[in-house]
Swiss-Prot record:
GO cellular component: cytoplasm
Residue sites binding ATP per the record: 12-19
Keyword set, alphabetical order: ATP-binding, Cytoplasm, Kinase, Nucleotide-binding, Transferase
Name of the featured protein: Uridine kinase
Source species: Listeria monocytogenes serovar 1/2a (strain ATCC BAA-679 / EGD-e)
């Protein structure tokens, strides 16, 4: 195979609309082979600590992720090598013993809140996208999602947001905006910005031979 894969990084705060942007890219390039890698399956394996201790971990901090493994996997995919991607158990806050074999694709989309925090990972990306959404909107989306999909109470979501999510966003996520090639305000609803982004991806795909 002569073409090199193109790696697109999509980041932004929790509830910013990263998933909507990622879906828009996938829909646009449905004729190409696409692989989506979520950063949050690369949380550290915590099988060696108790469930109670796992609950105390700050999952919005860069140290919560096994970034070295993620970097090695993205580098392997760029060389057209398969990887053994972790499978994360969100109910138990640790990895499953099983892994998922992933083959390289033409377009690799890496999505996550802290994918631009490490320069080694940034250097593996062809396009870096930051989805920039108002803090209040992001909070409301997270509140509704966690109450509906994860059975959380309103008080617990608010407490976590104020004590962990918001401070970590301001300290680690928001500052990575300066590394983005493209900033998309208001996420998946910004069709003009998404069209510009997909045009850029098409241009790079044509050159990657």
């Amino acid at each position: 195979m002569t073409k090199k894969p193109i790696v697109v990084g999509v980041t932004g705060g929790s509830g910013s609309g990263k998933t909507s942007v990622t879906k828009a890219i996938c829909n646009h390039f449905s004729g190409h082979s696409i692989l989506m890698i979520a950063q949050d399956v690369y949380y550290h394996d915590q099988a060696n600590i108790s469930f109670e201790d796992r609950l105390k971990v700050n999952y919005d901090h860069p140290l919560a992720f096994d970034t070295d493994l993620l970097i090695s996997h993205i580098a392997a995919l760029r060389r057209y090598e398969s990887i053994e991607k972790p499978i994360y158990d969100y109910a138990k806050y640790t990895r499953k013993k099983e892994v998922e074999i992933q083959e390289p694709r033409e377009v690799i989309i890496l999505e996550g809140i802290l994918i631009l925090e490490d320069k080694r990972l940034r250097d593996l990306m062809d396009i870096k996208v930051y989805v920039d959404t108002d803090d209040d909107i992001r909070f409301i989306r997270r509140l509704l999602r966690d109450m509906k999909e994860r059975g959380r109470t309103m008080d617990s979501v608010i407490e976590q947001y104020l004590s962990v999510v918001k401070p970590m966003h301001n300290e680690f996520i928001e500052p990575t905006k300066k590394f983005a090639d493209i900033i998309i305000p208001e996420g998946g609803e910004n069709h003009v910005a998404i069209d510009l982004m997909t045009t850029k991806i098409e241009s790079i795909l044509q050159k990657h031979v």
